[in-house]
């Protein structure tokens, strides 16, 4: 291939394109397409363009495409001059971003592995169906991937076969994740055989972090549904053990992970998830555990019922990953205390940027790598660049 051109509907779909290596260039075709479904008398293409650009920009700052474009019937855009003016600004901003981040390796604070049946074969392609279209069955999981697409983490996609061939592949990860509904290729199902189970338990027991979202490691076997129930500290009641008393329903609201959580949104609820006796429940509703943490040997397990994309949920996952990695004390390094604002660092150019991901002015405290901090005020969608 000389180049790869693809539709960009989110940060995840942008990384799907931009992370492809070995081609002369990559290009993202941004939304909206110039089609009558958006460009009509009552349509609002400007709003769609704004949401699309700001969402994709998080990922561009981690791994940029080389070119951006729009497609469709150009004549339709002529009736929306404000849209045309905004796209001009987007193009100018992209050129500025590209001049800063092209060929630069951004600072990665942690290394995170996503475990599923596909591994690198579907890098950033988990749960996706036809671009970034919303589906009731997957939005609780695509929010996790969308958050990861803009995090300052080195994200790897690991297949079950990868683990079987070399279990030590896990040792280089700060945290590994398993995300999805039961009996899908993304959660794994029967892929959790003895070599995989042993490798993951050993990894966490020796100090690793494991985060499960939805129905992780799920297969109805040996009287349990979540294969790594002992690591996660939770399991799902299928109706076979209803007379086994489940006493642990106490919620611990004050925790490192939930420190900035004000509005809970777990998406499509996985019903009947309960906690084991030693597990610490952080969020629960109607006798369904939504968020829980568990100690396993030297490591930690974290369970989340789901995670639709919002900047508040992005921060929740960010904190959960640092907690699972036993690195809470390191979180406030290159960190914004306002979850609507991101920070990206580029050591090779001695620069970093502070990014407002909203269309409202934002104020934040920025914590640098040495722990010192300063205040920043940002206009709507603004990016400010600084020297390290």
Language-model segment annotations:
Residues 1-171, 175-190, 194, 212-214, ...:
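Glycan-processing catalytic domains of CAZymes
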Residues 23-24, 206-209, 299:
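A short helix->loop->beta-strand "cap" motif at the edges of active sites that frequently abuts
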Residues 46-55, 64-111, 147-150, 180, ...:
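Extracellular ligand-binding/catalytic regions of CAZymes and related secreted enzymes
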Residues 116, 159-161, 214, 267, ...:
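Residues at the C-termini of beta-strands that transition into short coil/loop
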Residues 155-157, 210, 281, 301-303:
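Conserved beta-strand scaffold positions in the cores of enzyme catalytic domains, especially
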Residues 174, 208, 380-382:
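Surface-exposed loop/turn positions
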Residues 188-262:
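A glycine-rich, often tryptophan-bearing local segment used as a flexible ligand/cofactor-contacting loop or short
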Residues 265-276:
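Active-site Gly/Thr loop motif
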């Amino acid at each position: 291939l000389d180049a790869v051109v693809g539709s960009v509907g989110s940060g995840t779909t942008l990384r799907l394109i931009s992370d492809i290596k070995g081609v002369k260039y990559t290009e993202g075709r941004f939304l909206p397409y110039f089609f009558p479904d958006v460009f009509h008398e009552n349509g609002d293409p400007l709003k769609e363009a704004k949401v699309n650009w700001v969402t994709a920009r998080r990922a561009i700052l981690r791994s940029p495409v080389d070119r951006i474009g729009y497609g469709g019937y150009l004549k339709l855009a002529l009736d929306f001059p404000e849209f045309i003016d905004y796209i001009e600004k987007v193009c100018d901003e992209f050129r500025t971003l590209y001049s800063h981040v092209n060929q630069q390796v951004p600072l990665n604070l942690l290394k995170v592995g996503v475990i599923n049946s596909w591994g690198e074969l579907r890098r950033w392609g988990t749960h996706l169906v036809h671009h970034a279209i919303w589906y009731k069955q997957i939005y609780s999981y695509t929010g996790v991937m969308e958050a990861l697409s803009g995090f300052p983490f080195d994200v790897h996609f690991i297949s079950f076969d990868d683990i079987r061939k070399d279990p030590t592949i896990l040792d280089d990860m700060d945290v590994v994740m398993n995300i999805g509904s039961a009996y899908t290729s993304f959660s794994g199902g029967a892929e959790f055989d003895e070599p995989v189970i042993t490798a993951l338990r050993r990894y966490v027991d020796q100090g690793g972090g494991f985060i499960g979202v939805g129905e992780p490691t799920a297969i109805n076997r040996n009287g349990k549904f979540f294969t790594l129930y002992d690591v996660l500290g939770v399991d799902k009641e299928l109706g076979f053990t209803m007379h086994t008393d489940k006493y642990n329903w106490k919620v611990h609201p004050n925790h490192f992970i939930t420190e900035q959580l004000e509005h809970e949104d777990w998406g499509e609820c996985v019903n009947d998830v309960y906690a084991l006796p030693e597990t610490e429940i952080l969020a629960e509703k109607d006798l369904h555990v939504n968020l829980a943490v568990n100690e396993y040997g030297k490591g930690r397990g974290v369970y989340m019922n789901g995670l639709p994309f919002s900047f508040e949920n992005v921060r929740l996952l960010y904190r959960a990953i640092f907690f699972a990695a036993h690195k809470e004390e390191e979180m406030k390094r290159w960190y914004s205390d306002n979850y609507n604002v991101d920070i990206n660092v580029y050591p090779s150019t001695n620069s970093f940027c502070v990014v407002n991901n909203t269309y409202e002015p934002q104020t934040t405290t920025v914590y640098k790598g040495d722990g010192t901090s300063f205040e920043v005020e940002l206009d709507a969608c603004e990016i400010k660049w600084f020297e390290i």
